[in-house]
Amino acid sequence: MAEADSFLHLARPLGPVAVGTAPTTAPLNVVIQPQALFSILDHSLRRNADQERVIGTLLGTRSEDGTEVEIRSTFAVGHTETTDQVEVDMEYQKQMLALHLKANPKEVLVGWYATSSELNTFSALIQNFYSGQGDGTWPHPAVHLTVSTEAGKDIETRAYISAPVGVTAERAADSAAFIPVPYEIRYGEAEKSGLEAIGAARDAEERRANIFTDIEALERAIEDVLGMIDRVSRYVESVIDEEAPASTALGQYLLNTLALAPKVEPADIERDFNNHIQDVLVVSYLANTIRTQMELSNRLATAQLTLGGESGSGESGDKRGGQRGGKGGRGGQQRTQERSGEEARAPYPFLCQPRRTRSYEERTNEAQNGKEEKK
């Protein structure tokens, strides 16, 4: 959200302008991404107990005309600060900046941050370092973002640019006039939903939050919208009854919001909404069905592979035994076919029998028997 405090915003060249150099216009708006703020808060929580504040570098994008700066990411820079002097690890800052710009070529150096709302002489020194030529943001002004992180108080954020002050160049090097500029924290619906889910665990003892389903999230969103409508209605009624002061800006905002409402009948809106709910339910049912089918298919494939490996060995053994038995069967069958072929070639099977060879004793006995018969 934008800063509510009123201030005078000056758009003017910052720093000494060289001959032939066009004047640089200060940014009219600073956009802060939520992840950049989270990084700053995390750095503040990890600081040493004796450190009052920590500083770091701001990275982001800048519009072509330089009127808008978007802060997307940050990284911490070590520094030592006392009542008399301040020391910043400039070499570390340069190396980390080179690494970040190599990983994200679209981002550029836009400024620096500090976790304290106080502006002092050391702030001017650091500001001049970040806005200088060479490794600084020159010819664009450097944005200084302050984030107060005092315990027990709300987080307060401010954005500044600087203008050089001082009669001489030596005095201008350690002096600067900080000029506040408007800013806004811009986030999308996904980031808002994630932040609400994280914030739901704030009051829980276990610091855990359950993730809502689509239907539950839709129900909560509708309840929030109804609550906001009731709150706005009560405010409008109190203004009409002169119980609360009127706000022209708020009235204009409400008027613009009402102008965005579609000019349709409530019955048509209800019908379209019910159709949308039916579509969401159908898509959810189909997604669950496909997920279940895929899981079942994977389990069946796994079971088939497991059972196939066990039965494969048994089938191979049976196959080998069958092959051996088959060979014997083919041999016997072949011999049977040969015998049947010989029988077919002989019209009288008994003629094909081989002659029996008689021994010497048998022939002698036959001869004696023949002599006796003759007698």
UniProtKB/Swiss-Prot annotation:
Domain MPN: 30-166
Protein name: Eukaryotic translation initiation factor 3 subunit F
GO cellular component term, pick one: eukaryotic 43S preinitiation complex
Subcellular location: Cytoplasm
Predominant subcellular localization, coarse grouping: cytoplasm
Gene Ontology annotations of biological process type: formation of cytoplasmic translation initiation complex
Stored PROSITE patterns: MPN
Subunit structure of this chain's protein: Component of the eukaryotic translation initiation factor 3 (eIF-3) complex.
Residue ranges, compositional bias (Gly residues): 323-332
PANTHER family, A to Z: EUKARYOTIC TRANSLATION INITIATION FACTOR 3 SUBUNIT F, EUKARYOTIC TRANSLATION INITIATION FACTOR 3 SUBUNIT F-RELATED
A Pfam family recorded for this sequence: MitMem_reg
Biological function: Component of the eukaryotic translation initiation factor 3 (eIF-3) complex, which is involved in protein synthesis of a specialized repertoire of mRNAs and, together with other initiation factors, stimulates binding of mRNA and methionyl-tRNAi to the 40S ribosome. The eIF-3 complex specifically targets and initiates translation of a subset of mRNAs involved in cell proliferation.
Region (Disordered) residue spans: 307-375
UniProt keyword list: Cytoplasm, Initiation factor, Protein biosynthesis
GO molecular function: metallopeptidase activity; translation initiation factor activity; translation initiation factor binding
